[in-house]
Amino acid sequence: MSQAIPSSRVGVKINEWYKMIRQFSVPDAEILKAEVEQDIQQMEEDQDLLIYYSLMCFRHQLMLDYLEPGKTYGNRPTVTELLETIETPQKKLTGLLKYYSLFFRGMYEFDQKEYVEAIGYYREAEKELPFVSDDIEKAEFHFKVAEAYYHMKQTHVSMYHILQALDIYQNHPLYSIRTIQSLFVIAGNYDDFKHYDKALPHLEAALELAMDIQNDRFIAISLLNIANSYDRSGDDQMAVEHFQKAAKVSREKVPDLLPKVLFGLSWTLCKAGQTQKAFQFIEEGLDHITARSHKFYKELFLFLQAVYKETVDERKIHDLLSYFEKKNLHAYIEACARSAAAVFESSCHFEQAAAFYRKVLKAQEDILKGECLYAY
């Protein structure tokens, strides 16, 4: 009878697997995952290590869903199914395993655009952070927290965390994708501060790095973020130019990104009064929405149709704003209500315009109240 493989040896291999996941190296991660699964069949009994393995399967699938949304991998369980396997023993977990369980669950909630839920899990994970000794893992924590607070428009808190993450990533060349993503978050925060001149250099640096590593997805995302920055600064011409560049790369290389790009392009054209051209891109965007993960962008396209068609669909606008309210997406409420108000104001429907401007003010108040998310 062959001797059982020590669980410590399998644990080392799981650590290597996680390293490849954090580097977004799918082929290497797949190879190590298969090796770990084979070793576990011959491993000595170790319940903690099996939990660690389950957590890493969950994290592996989160990576795949981010890089290749909608793609299936044989009979593998989905993220939702994997979530059930890691939730069951959670109350028994301590230390590093508890940290991973909470941190990965926060990442899942973030991907579902449940940002308040995500921050709640990250805050619980932070209590276990003293058990984390690896610098890259600390950078991962700061990056994900910064990302969540950015989406909740808690700009100062986001900037505090992202600078800590970037300081680590920049010293590790293998983590160039996380460096690019960190530059995105910094630029987004500068945009929220309305310092557009400070945002663009970070986005251009991200684009240059993405081109250096020849990563089509992040080339497209960099172009998209540059376009969004120009749009926020009011430079419609430069925004449209970069949206179209992002759309070209997306159509050719990363089609799952196309609805997001076309939404940004459509909205900019609508605000610039080029609604006929915008509605062509809206139709193209809706045609590309098949996966459940794009439901959010379907709602946004429907919002544009409701606001900018010849007869404004006020009820539909209110329904969509209610959808955003349920998800605490106050920044989206602010931007969408502002667009609706501007359209009503331009057609001299001042009562409706005033009602939507009040929603803008309410959303701004809710964003400021969001500071309670990180009050201890």
Curated annotation (Swiss-Prot):
Stated induction or repression of this protein's expression = Part of the rapH-phrH operon, which is transcribed from the SigA-driven rapH promoter. Activated by the late competence transcription factor ComK. Repressed by RghR.
Tell me which SUPFAM superfamilies the record gives: TPR-like
| Phenotypic consequence of L55A | No change in phosphatase activity in vitro
Q: Sorted alphabetically, which Pfam families does this protein's record hold?
A: RapH_N (PF18801), TPR_7 (PF13176)
Q: What is its main location?
A: cytoplasm
The terms describing its cellular component in GO are:
cytoplasm
- Identify which top EC class this enzyme belongs to: hydrolase
Q: If researchers knock out this gene, what phenotype do they report? A: Deletion of the gene induces both differentiation pathways and interferes with their temporal separation.
What Gene Ontology molecular-function terms does this entry list?
A: phosphoprotein phosphatase activity
Relate the outcome reported for changing Q47N.
Answer: Loss of phosphatase activity in vitro. Displays reduced activity in vivo
User: What are the UniProt keywords, alphabetically?
Assistant: Competence, Cytoplasm, Hydrolase, Protein phosphatase, Repeat, Sporulation, TPR repeat
What InterPro entries does its record include? Bac_ResReg_Asp_Phosphatase, TPR-like_helical_dom_sf, TPR_rpt
Classify the source by domain of life.
Bacteria
Regulation of this protein's activity per its record = Both activities are inhibited by RapH.
Look up what happens after changing Y175A.
Decrease in phosphatase activity in vitro. Displays reduced activity in vivo
- The TPR repeat boundaries are 99-132, 139-172, 180-213, 220-253, 259-292, 334-367
Effect of changing Q47E: reported as: No change in phosphatase activity in vitro
According to the record, mutating E137A results in: Decrease in phosphatase activity in vitro. Displays reduced activity in vivo
Q: Where in the cell is it found?
A: Cytoplasm
Per the UniProt record, which EC number(s) apply here?
3.1.3.-
The biological process GO terms on file are: establishment of competence for transformation; sporulation resulting in formation of a cellular spore
What's the stated role of this polypeptide?
Dual specificity regulatory protein that can control both sporulation and competence by acting on two distinct response regulators: Spo0F and ComA, respectively. Is involved in the temporal separation of competence and sporulation. Acts as a phosphatase that specifically dephosphorylates the sporulation initiation phosphotransferase Spo0F and inhibits its activity. RapH can also antagonize sporulation by sterically blocking phosphoryl transfer to and from Spo0F. In addition, inhibits the activity of ComA, a transcriptional factor that regulates the development of genetic competence.
What does the subunit comment say? Homodimer. Interacts with phosphorylated Spo0F. Each RapH protomer is bound to a monomer of Spo0F, forming a heterotetrameric complex. May also interact with non-phosphorylated Spo0F to inhibit the sporulation phosphorelay. Interacts with the C-terminal DNA-binding region of ComA. Does not interact with DegU.
User: What does the entry's domain section say?
Assistant: Contains a small N-terminal 3-helix bundle domain and a large C-terminal TPR domain, connected by a linker region.
The UniProt similarity line reads:
Belongs to the Rap family.
Protein's name according to its UniProt entry:
Response regulator aspartate phosphatase H
Which species does the entry assign this protein to? Bacillus subtilis (strain 168)
